[in-house]
Amino acid sequence: MSIQRTFVMIKPDGVRRNLIGEIISRFEKRGLKIIGLKMVKIDRPTAERLYEEHKGKSFFEELISYITSGPVVCMVIEGDEAVSVVRKMIGNTDPKEAPPGTIRGDYALSKAENVIHASDSEEKAKREMSIFFKEEELVTPLAQVHM
């Protein structure tokens, strides 16, 4: 058993379409814990930090414009093998390749409006979490606190 933390963000289309509760519910039903949660409007410099690996690619400007177009919900999720479990749950970036039952398979409209972002490695998770959360903002669920 390897307890990990990962970063997840419900993108503007997911927020706009009122999918926040449904998405969070899927993670909780899978036994994952939400230990950090906030709704924010991302500014351009923050978006560029988050997606720095895509800088210079043809879709970069469209991605930055989209991710700054409305509020997003940022989460830190903790659980056994959280990075890979969450990646499986969200499905392929292209909704045509995402199986039904995955978040993108069920809700994504296109490659651009694909509802959700999740870190694809522990290293990226640490970097992405640090953009949006301070360590002291993360909360251990009460069920895990020993009294």
Curated annotation (Swiss-Prot):
ATP binds at K11, F59, R87, T93, R104, N114. The active site is at H117 (pros-phosphohistidine intermediate). Disulfide bonds: none annotated. GO terms for molecular function: ATP binding; metal ion binding; nucleoside diphosphate kinase activity. Its main location: cytoplasm. It is found in: Cytoplasm. It comes from the Archaea. It is an enzyme of class 2 (transferase). Its EC number is 2.7.4.6. InterPro entries: NDK-like_dom, NDK-like_dom_sf, Nucleoside_diP_kinase, Nucleoside_diP_kinase_AS. It catalyses: a 2'-deoxyribonucleoside 5'-diphosphate + ATP = a 2'-deoxyribonucleoside 5'-triphosphate + ADP; a ribonucleoside 5'-diphosphate + ATP = a ribonucleoside 5'-triphosphate + ADP. Its cofactor is Mg(2+). CDD domains: NDPk_I (cd04413). One of its GO terms (cellular component) is cytoplasm. PROSITE patterns: NDPK (PS00469), NDPK_LIKE (PS51374). Keywords: ATP-binding, Cytoplasm, Kinase, Magnesium, Metal-binding, Nucleotide metabolism, Nucleotide-binding, Phosphoprotein, Transferase. One of its GO terms (biological process) is GTP biosynthetic process. Major role in the synthesis of nucleoside triphosphates other than ATP. The ATP gamma phosphate is transferred to the NDP beta phosphate via a ping-pong mechanism, using a phosphorylated active-site intermediate. Belongs to the NDK family. This is Nucleoside diphosphate kinase. It comes from Sulfurisphaera tokodaii (strain DSM 16993 / JCM 10545 / NBRC 100140 / 7). The lineage of its organism: Archaea, Thermoproteota, Thermoprotei, Sulfolobales, Sulfolobaceae.
